[in-house]
Structure formats: C-alpha cells, structure tokens
Amino acid sequence: MREIVWRPRAVADVDGILSYIVLEYRSPKAAQSCADAISQAVERVAELPETGRLFADDDLERTYRRVLAKNYWIYYSYDADTITVWRVFHTSQDHDTYGFALLEE
C-alpha cells in the first residue's frame, strides 16, 4: 500500500466537515461515521489508486483523481509510492468557489 499524505488544506477540509456535522446535527456519531468513510476511501485508493475517477481541469497543471465517500469528493494524486490527498468537498459545493484551482500551493 502506498503512503498516504494529507495536504494541510485537505486536513482543514475534513476538520470543517466534521465540526459542521457535530455542531449542525449535534451528532458526534454521524461525524465519526463520516470520518470513517473518508478514511476508508483513502485507504482503498492507496491500494488501488486507478479506481478513482480522472478529474482534469484546464486551470490545473496535473491530472487528479477523485473518489466518493458518502457525500464527499476526495481529490488525490498518486505516484509509485504515495497517495496525496489534496481536497475534500461536499458534492453540493462549487469547487471553483472553494479554491480548487489553488491546489498546487
């Protein structure tokens, strides 16, 4: 299995998602379920990274892949040794509005 590297922005995304679930729905159990689903999805793509859907954007220099975990898209790239998780978005979010074009930073 490849090493999993979480970019700071992806960590902040997940922290925000889990905080929102706890505060909005008052459900730590639902937040834990979401965290588990995201973690399991990342572990699966670390084993088989080609399973994620290709995602290319004209504004981005590299091609990314994405995988769905519950209602969240996880955007990642990979090489022979590493999976890099770049962002995690709710499916209803406008990715351009939320800085997807700034992944390279």
Q: Predicted regions span which residues?
A:
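Basic, Lys/Arg-enriched alpha-helical interface segments
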Residues: R2-L60, D96-Y98, E104-E105
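Basic/aromatic recognition patch in beta-strand/loop cores that engages polyanionic ligands
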Residues: E50-T82
